[in-house]
UniProtKB/Swiss-Prot annotation:
The gene is uppP. It holds the Pfam family BacA. The chain crosses the membrane at residues 38-58, 65-85, 92-112, 126-146, 166-186, 191-211, 217-237. This is Undecaprenyl-diphosphatase. Belongs to the UppP family.
Amino acid sequence: MDLLLGIIQGLTEFLPVSSSGHLTLLSHLLKTDLNAYQTAVLHLGTLVSVVLFAFDGIRRSLRSWRIILNLIVSTIPAGVFGVLFEKQIDQLFSSPRFLPLFFSVTALILMFTRYSSSGEKRMENMSFLDALLVGIAQLFALFPGISRSGITVSSLLFMKYRGEDALQYSFLMSIPVVLGAGILGLEKGNITILAPIFAFLSGLFALYVLSRSVRSGKIWQFSYYCLFVAILSYLVG
């Protein structure tokens, strides 16, 4: 079970298909109880993979005070919302009832990137307003079925940022949110150490695939898969 959870978490955390949605669906299919805290523990494995994968870019980015301040602004919406509605969010992980809706939202967002022209805005020059807007987008990824990487990268592409910068900023945004949730999950979850390890290994592969799809402008292709999972979750829900 830990092997399966870890692999699914690693692959779906960075591919824009929602890891939390997949884990909620798997929990329903296997009749197991997987809550938001246990999911957060799995995130710690993928957190290590993103730090290693993008280490040089992260190190360069964090030399800029503007980027650091923007990251703080981007983190606030999800952090505040997660604390205020902690119990309600956790309840969403106990049932697949809303998965068809949330997976469909992810599919729609990804599909729109196909018709969004490429931009030239750089992460180093991001305004506080843009940082806040992408932070608001990220808070919706607290709902299982809405992809964090999908909604943050897509939002930045819609705001005319370069694909590379959208990807890099999405990576940076994930660190404080995932770290905070993971630490909380360590206290309340009961996932063994094997699951995060498998999540780390499969996460590295997923990061490579995501990077190639964003750079080639083909992230929208994942919308078909999200639509398929939306239909599947409706049929089994």
